[in-house]
Design a protein with these regions (language model features):
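Conserved structural motif at the start of ABC-family nucleotide-binding domains
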Residues: 19, 33-34
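The feature captures the beta-strand-to-loop junction immediately N-terminal to the Walker
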Residues: 50-52
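Helix-to-loop junction immediately C-terminal to a conserved catalytic motif
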Residues: 65
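Conserved ABC transporter NBD signature motif
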Residues: 73-81, 90
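A short, proline-enriched helix->beta-strand linker immediately N-terminal to the Walker B motif
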Residues: 170-174
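Catalytic Walker B motif of ABC-type/P-loop ATPase nucleotide-binding domains
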Residues: 176-180, 185
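ABC ATPase nucleotide-binding domains
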Residues: 245-278
Length: 278
């Protein structure tokens, strides 16, 4: 059973496998960025992290990845505190796709994807047959096989994002964290990337700004506002006109479309008119 206010299973015997955050808080520059946030993604599903700028989405992803430590609360991986799990072990199970990626080294696409095998190899050891098979599989799953010999510098934004995902897949993770991967992509590339991630059937947590993309592709969403969880649960239950007005301060019309009844959101204007003279 899931409580829509927290998105957490209310069953005391709930499975503790995978990556989860319990009661996580984090401050930065004296400001509370995350305030008692709990997140327990269901295995094999895509969870969207939603919220306005500054709501804590990227910070939560960095805490889940172990890049930042929470000030209170705990992040666990298969029931063990993430801070006690060796970094190489974490890297073999949790992959991260950043919002922006660049390199000063003139890598080919295949070489960039091979970086995903680093957690599986000893220092200075050559690639194994298993490494190369993982790279070939990642290139194929992301539709990059024909671009394997291309230089990173010649790639479009959408192609670079696919390379990042291929690199993450080469890690052979169980959990995939993505920080606003659709930013700066045109509509076709946004849809292609979302369909790719949704079809992976890994446990994915993705920060998103576009509510309609979240409605189309996510299994569950968690809505953050000023560092706190406002709502969490299936997209059909969470993305309501009332929540959009409360969190984003805009009026919206939410309709159910298609055989699956997923929400479609049409924005109508600000939720409140500006004060006279404001």
């Amino acid at each position: 059973m899931t409580d829509i206010s927290t998105g957490v299973s209310t069953d005391a015997s709930a499975d503790v496998t995978g990556l989860r955050a319990d009661g996580v808080s984090r401050t930065a520059g004296g400001a509370l960025v995350l305030d008692d946030v709990t997140l327990a993604p269901r295995p094999g599903t895509l969870t969207g992290l939603l919220g306005p700028n500054g709501s804590g989405k990227s910070t939560l992803l960095r805490v889940l990845a172990g890049v930042l430590a929470p000030d209170s609360g705990v992040v666990t991986l298969d029931g063990d505190r993430l801070s006690t799990v060796p970094r190489r072990t974490v890297a073999r199970q949790v992959a991260v796709v950043e919002q922006h990626a660049d390199t000063q080294v003139d890598l080919t696409v295949a070489d960039a994807v091979r970086l995903g095998r680093v957690p599986h190899r000893r220092a200075w050891s050559p690639s194994t047959a298993a490494d190369e098979e993982a790279v070939r599989s990642a290139l194929a799953r992301t539709g990059l096989t024909d671009l394997a010999a291309r230089s990173w510098r010649t790639l479009s934004g959408g192609e670079r994002q696919r390379v990042q995902i291929a690199r993450a897949l080469a890690q052979e993770p169980r959990e995939l964290l993505l920080d606003e991967p659709t930013n700066h992509l045109d509509i076709q590339h946004q849809l292609d990337l979302m369909a790719l991630v949704a079809g992976l059937r890994l446990t994915c947590v993705m920060a998103l700004h576009d509510l309609n993309l979240a409605a189309m592709f996510c299994d569950h969403v968690v809505v953050l506002h000023e560092g706190r969880t406002m709502a969490a649960g299936p997209v059909e239950e969470v993305l309501t006109e009332r929540l959009i007005a409360d969190v984003y301060r805009v009026r919206a019309s939410v309709t159910r479309e298609g055989p699956d009844g997923r929400p479609h959101i049409r924005f109508l204007g600000p939720a409140q008119a500006p004060a006279p003279g404001g």
